[in-house]
UniProtKB/Swiss-Prot annotation:
Gene: rlmI
Function: Specifically methylates the cytosine at position 1962 (m5C1962) of 23S rRNA.
Family matches, as Gene3D superfamilies: PUA domain, RNA methyltransferase domain (HRMD) like, Vaccinia Virus protein VP39
Cross-referenced InterPro entries: PUA, PUA-like_sf, PUA_sf, RLMI, RlmI-like_PUA, SAM-dep_methyl-trfase, SAM-dependent_MTases_sf
Organism: Escherichia coli (strain UTI89 / UPEC)
Catalytic activity line of the entry: cytidine(1962) in 23S rRNA + S-adenosyl-L-methionine = 5-methylcytidine(1962) in 23S rRNA + S-adenosyl-L-homocysteine + H(+)
Protein name: Ribosomal RNA large subunit methyltransferase I
């Protein structure tokens, strides 16, 4: 008999709506003993079967649902089916947009909670972010090897969130050759170098692909400031869009060096690209105080908020940095501003920008809205999957 997690009375509603998480407060008791990440059955207070998921005793998310089908076992065949389902959509996208790199698995939204897989050419970069994902590592890798024999698999599960579920951080090759120091990929006509082994996340922010392309419509003959530039994806896109100058700012010397290489790789005019290693908050104030002006500013900061207790502080940070950006824009200038914090709703982010405009003493029009690229889908029953939001704002 399988181990069962019994829900408290009245706490089954979210599962009946097919939300994939069970929080610790919804649990009445465990029937049997389960190891970290082990598959369990989830039942209501009367014993009615609801779902099958992975158990995580140390996490606030006590179980993550693998399946709502009682006949479905969690094995190699299960992961093979999920991967094949996900690949169908990515095949269509890759053909339509000419992609050689994309997010293959977007966690819960692809029916594989706690699992992220990005494909860069013939490298699959894997992040196992939950106890259940780690427990099923061998089955998942077996399915990947069968479906993608041409691909090497590299582990980038060096993510702090694993510690919350009692797991060590892991990184390194799983199968196949080691990724090169910098792997070239293609995106909307750009060639870009990706550092799989040491770069942020899995090496590159694939979720901003469509936003980088959209930038081009705003930048012709414009002076652009690219904040938190990382390896220069927005900068390269701005140069391809015909900007007169782009200034890329980041604290990482390594990232800025790759950004410079990306400009050269695309045979763009390096004299139009400036690379500044500095703290963005500090530099924006310096620019303001000396009267610098820009026509377009890209504001793509890292995540400011990891949990609800940090949300108010994050709101202040987003407001401050957008206020400074608005102050630096010429009349009619465009602010392309983003938040990748899942706890920051689109409505709240829009309000923060509006408040920032008031503090900056400028009027702002919202003219376009952005979200993560289509290879990062959001399943309807899991709205938390929509983590990236952005706006194009015209400053008056």
């Amino acid at each position: 008999m399988s181990v069962r997690l019994v829900l408290a009375k009245g706490r089954e509603k979210s599962l009946l709506r097919r939300h994939p998480w069970v929080f610790s407060g919804a649990v009445a008791r465990m029937e049997g003993k389960a190891n970290l990440g082990e598959t369990i059955d989830i039942v209501d207070h009367q014993g009615k079967w609801l779902a099958r998921g992975a158990y995580s005793p140390a996490s606030q998310i006590r179980a993550r649902v693998w399946t709502f089908d009682p006949s479905e076992s969690i094995d190699i065949a299960f992961f093979t089916r999920r991967l094949q389902q996900a690949q169908k959509w990515r095949d269509w996208l890759a053909q339509k947009d000419g992609l050689d790199s994309y997010r293959l698995i977007a966690g819960e939204s692809d029916g594989l909670p706690g699992i992220t897989i990005d494909r860069f050419g013939n490298f699959l970069v894997l992040q196992l972010l939950s106890a259940g994902a780690e427990y099923q590592r061998a089955a998942l890798i077996s399915a990947l090897q069968t479906l993608y024999p041409e691909c090497a698999i590299y582990d980038r599960s060096d993510v702090a969130v694993r510690k919350k579920e009692g797991m060590e951080l892991t990184q390194g090759p799983i199968t196949g050759e080691l990724p090169p120091a910098l792997l070239p990929i293609e995106e909307h006509g750009m060639k870009l170098l990706v550092d799989i082994q040491h770069g942020h996340k899995t090496g590159y922010y694939l979720d901003q692909r469509d936003s980088r392309l959209a930038t081009r419509r705003y930048v012709e003959n414009k002076r652009v400031l690219n904040c938190f530039s990382y390896t220069g994806g927005f900068a390269v896109s701005a140069l391809m869009g015909g900007c007169s100058q782009v200034v890329s700012v980041d604290t990482s010397h390594e990232a800025l060096d790759i950004a410079r290489q990306n400009v050269e790789l695309n045979k763009l005019d390096l004299s139009k690209a400036e690379f500044v290693r500095d703290d963005v908050f500090k530099l924006l104030r310096t620019y303001r105080d000396r009267g610098e002006k820009f026509d377009v500013i890209v504001m793509d900061p890292p995540k400011f908020v990891e949990n609800k207790s940090q949300l108010m502080g994050a709101c202040r940070g987003y407001k401050d940095i957008n206020m400074l950006a608005i102050q630096l824009l010429n009349e009619g200038g465009i602010l392309l501003t983003f938040s990748c914090s899942g706890l920051m709703t689109s409505d709240l982010f829009q309000k923060i920008i509006a408040d920032a405009a008031i503090d900056a003493g400028r009027d702002v029009q919202f003219i376009e809205q952005f979200r993560q690229a289509a290879d990062h889908p959001v399943i309807a029953t899991y709205p938390e999957g929509l983590y990236l939001k952005g706006f194009a704002c015209r400053v008056m």
